[in-house]
């Protein structure tokens, strides 16, 4: 018998450039939709507004939320987290323990997270690194002029 928990819905979103401020964000979803809904940016699809939101691609981002795990779920030999369309460089933590690293939006990831879970309340965080900044770091490490 299989069991699953759906973690889609409202999460908290925080930028590396903000102190303690968070905004609500839906997953599946994206940063720009959350920023627009929170009134933090103009509509990037209107006029030349895209130019006004370029800075946000250089931020690191963190999605987080709490979720409950029924004790029965921990009776299974394995408890897997499946992540799809994670764009792009991200680390997933459950209760502060790293359970998954992602580097490719087009890869489906699966990790056994049972050891990180506890019955009752749990916290999951997805920490995204700026793809632009990570690409620049990788390019600088290449042996080419």
Across the structure, where does each feature detected by a protein language model lie?
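Accessory beta-strand-rich segments of carbohydrate-active enzymes
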Residues: 3-5, 9-18, 30-38, 53, ...
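Short Gly/aromatic-enriched secondary-structure transition segments
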Residues: 21-29
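Short amphipathic alpha-helical segments, especially helix-boundary/capping motifs
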Residues: 39-43
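Surface-exposed, low-complexity/disordered Ser/Thr/Gly/Pro/Asn-rich loops and linkers
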Residues: 44-54
């Amino acid at each position: 018998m299989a069991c699953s928990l759906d973690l889609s819905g409202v999460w908290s979103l925080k930028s590396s450039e903000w102190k303690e401020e968070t905004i609500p964000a839906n997953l599946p979803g994206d940063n720009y939709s959350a920023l627009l809904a929170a009134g933090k940016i103009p509509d990037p699809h209107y006029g030349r507004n895209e130019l006004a939101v370029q800075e946000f691609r250089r931020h690191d981002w963190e999605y987080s939320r709490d979720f409950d795990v029924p004790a029965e779920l921990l009776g299974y030999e394995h408890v897997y987290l499946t992540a799809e369309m994670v764009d792009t460089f991200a680390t997933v933590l459950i209760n502060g323990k790293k359970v998954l690293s992602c580097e490719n939006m087009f890869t489906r990831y699966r990790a056994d997270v049972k050891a990180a879970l506890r019955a009752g309340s749990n916290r999951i965080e997805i920490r995204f690194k700026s793809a632009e900044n990570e690409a620049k770091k990788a390019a600088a490490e290449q042996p080419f002029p």
